[in-house]
Amino acid sequence: MDVKCKDIHYSIGEKKILNGVSLKVEGGQFQTILGPNGSGKSTLLKTIYRQLKPDSGHILLDGKSLDQVSLKETAKEMAVVTQFNTLQFDCTVEEIVMLARTPHLSFLQKESERDHLLVQDALDKVGMSEKKTRYYSSLSGGEKQRVILARALAQEPKLLLLDEPTNHLDIKYQLEMLALVKELGINVLAVLHDIQLACRFSDYIYLMKGGEIVAQGVPRDAVTPQSLQAVYDVQSRITWTDDQQAMIQYL
């Protein structure tokens, strides 16, 4: 599922949160939005997955206006992983991941063998199979995050939105999660905090400040001493490795 945002504006009262943001994710790319807190990154994602309605502008999914795409169709093809995953009810790990199959089932239809296989495969990929009978409330923050990623994988999405998904994870699982997502080969739009992780895994990067995109491009073009100065107000020196890893020294 391709997504295109065109001139998105969003305000809370007199405060402008998004000011004419435009971007597109297509071709199975992993794209990342970077920027300081309050720059509008998460707000932009929320307009795409319909938690917030923009004041103006257009959001297109596969060329169709967001208003013309049903919630059920969106739920089949778009998955979301956020940094805060509090549930109002307690279920086992396996039950939570199985919820991903709900949009693919008709009313009162039972889960098929394929549904169960997809859930098991997703749990295997995030290393949570041995805890599938545990209750979600008993898990650590990092384990909960891996369960939510498994749920997204079991959904078989064509578009994956990630809002700071690695915040609660140890570095080992941060690397594993982003590598796993990258290998899916689907459209991904992620908000990340770690600039070096973003450079390593992203095909394209946007840098936001004050509700606007101020720099964009492939990692080497987007992440420069000049753009980091403009966005984060820091001086830096950047060295790039052959495998697209950015070694950033702050001065």
Task: Write out the residue ranges for each language-model feature.
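Conserved ABC transporter NBD signature motif
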Residues: 57-65, 74, 134
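Conserved ABC ATPase signature
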Residues: 110, 135-139, 143
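Conserved ABC ATPase "signature" region
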Residues: 98, 113-131
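Helix-to-loop junction immediately C-terminal to a conserved catalytic motif
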Residues: 49
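Catalytic Walker B motif of ABC-type/P-loop ATPase nucleotide-binding domains
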Residues: 160-164
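Conserved structural motif at the start of ABC-family nucleotide-binding domains
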Residues: 3-5, 17-20
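A short, proline-enriched helix->beta-strand linker immediately N-terminal to the Walker B motif
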Residues: 154-158
